[in-house]
């Protein structure tokens, strides 16, 4: 099994890249977001891969991080989700956002992904929820935030959400209710953690 391929980026197409290593060009299917995050052709890249073997075909699916690859592997373990469907899903949602959606029983967010209907969305939640732990999801998200630009608005919003959910869980609310309540708070980017927490608490009282 190939864990990753490190070599020269030879070609970039919308959903496929070619990486040359030791004189061999590897055709690798990637999420739609990956081409825009890659360096220029000719640069060295490291792509974490999954090899899908069929009777008449052998395909490589690649990701920029082990975390994304891990989420991909979890998705294809769900009955009815193949590599192409999993790749399509991760082209439209980050691994962290998908985890939060699963923990929050957010069927609407998951069924909005291409190729995923209501029944499949429910199946994803049922089959993956027991494999995810809230503290590990937060740790992963916060770790990525620390690596991001401290002035990044997206990073700041994620940290505020995480702080609010953690506070609600510490107050005795379930992770599902906490996630749903915080998600419903509007205009988070213009609010601090305390304000978001107060508004989320008001929503929980109405539940």
Curated annotation (Swiss-Prot):
Q: Per its record, how is this protein called by name? A: Holliday junction branch migration complex subunit RuvA
For the region Domain II, what residue ranges are annotated?
65-143
Main location per the UniProt record = cytoplasm
> Is DNA repair tagged as a keyword?
yes
Quaternary structure, per UniProt, is: Homotetramer. Forms an RuvA(8)-RuvB(12)-Holliday junction (HJ) complex. HJ DNA is sandwiched between 2 RuvA tetramers; dsDNA enters through RuvA and exits via RuvB. An RuvB hexamer assembles on each DNA strand where it exits the tetramer. Each RuvB hexamer is contacted by two RuvA subunits (via domain III) on 2 adjacent RuvB subunits; this complex drives branch migration. In the full resolvosome a probable DNA-RuvA(4)-RuvB(12)-RuvC(2) complex forms which resolves the HJ.
Annotated function: The RuvA-RuvB-RuvC complex processes Holliday junction (HJ) DNA during genetic recombination and DNA repair, while the RuvA-RuvB complex plays an important role in the rescue of blocked DNA replication forks via replication fork reversal (RFR). RuvA specifically binds to HJ cruciform DNA, conferring on it an open structure. The RuvB hexamer acts as an ATP-dependent pump, pulling dsDNA into and through the RuvAB complex. HJ branch migration allows RuvC to scan DNA until it finds its consensus sequence, where it cleaves and resolves the cruciform DNA.
Could you name the domain of life of the organism this protein comes from? Bacteria
Region listing for Domain I, in residue ranges: 1-64
* Species of provenance: Lachnospira eligens (strain ATCC 27750 / DSM 3376 / VPI C15-48 / C15-B4)
**UniProt keyword list:** Cytoplasm, DNA damage, DNA recombination, DNA repair, DNA-binding
Q: What's the name of its gene?
A: ruvA
Q: Where is this region: Flexible linker?
A: 144-155
Which GO annotations describe the biological process of this protein?
DNA recombination; DNA repair
Localisation per UniProt entry: Cytoplasm
Sample GO molecular function, one term: ATP binding
Homology family: Belongs to the RuvA family.
> Which intervals of the chain are annotated as region Domain III?
156-207
Q: Report the InterPro entries cross-referenced here.
A: DNA_helicase_Holl-junc_RuvA_I, Hlx-hairpin-Hlx_DNA-bd_motif, NA-bd_OB-fold, RuvA, RuvA_2-like, RuvA_C, RuvA_C_sf
Question: Which parts form a coiled-coil structure per UniProt?
Answer: none
Gene Ontology terms, cellular component aspect?
A: cytoplasm; Holliday junction helicase complex; Holliday junction resolvase complex
**Domain remarks:** Has three domains with a flexible linker between the domains II and III and assumes an 'L' shape. Domain III is highly mobile and contacts RuvB.
């Amino acid at each position: 099994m190939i864990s990753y391929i490190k070599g020269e980026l030879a070609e970039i197409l919308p959903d496929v890249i070619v990486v040359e290593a030791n004189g061999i060009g590897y055709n690798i299917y990637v999420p739609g977001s990956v081409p825009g995050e890659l360096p220029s052709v000719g640069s060295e890249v490291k792509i974490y891969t999954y090899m899908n073997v069929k009777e008449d075909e052998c395909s490589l699916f690649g990701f920029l991080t082990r975390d994304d690859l891990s989420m991909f592997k979890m998705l294809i373990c769900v009955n009815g989700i193949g590599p192409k469907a999993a790749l399509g899903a991760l082209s439209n949602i980050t691994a962290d956002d998908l985890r939060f959606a699963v923990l929050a029983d957010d069927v609407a967010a998951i069924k909005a992904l291409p190729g995923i209907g209501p029944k499949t969305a429910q199946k994803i939640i049922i089959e993956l929820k027991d494999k995810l732990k809230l503290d590990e999801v937060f740790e992963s998200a916060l770790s990525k935030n620390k690596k991001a630009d401290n002035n990044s608005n997206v990073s700041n919003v994620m940290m505020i959400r995480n702080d609010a959910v953690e506070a609600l869980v510490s107050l005795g609310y379930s992770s599902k209710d906490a996630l749903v309540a915080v998600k419903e708070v509007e205009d988070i980017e213009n609010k601090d953690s305390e304000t978001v927490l107060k508004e989320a608490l008001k929503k929980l009282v109405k539940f």
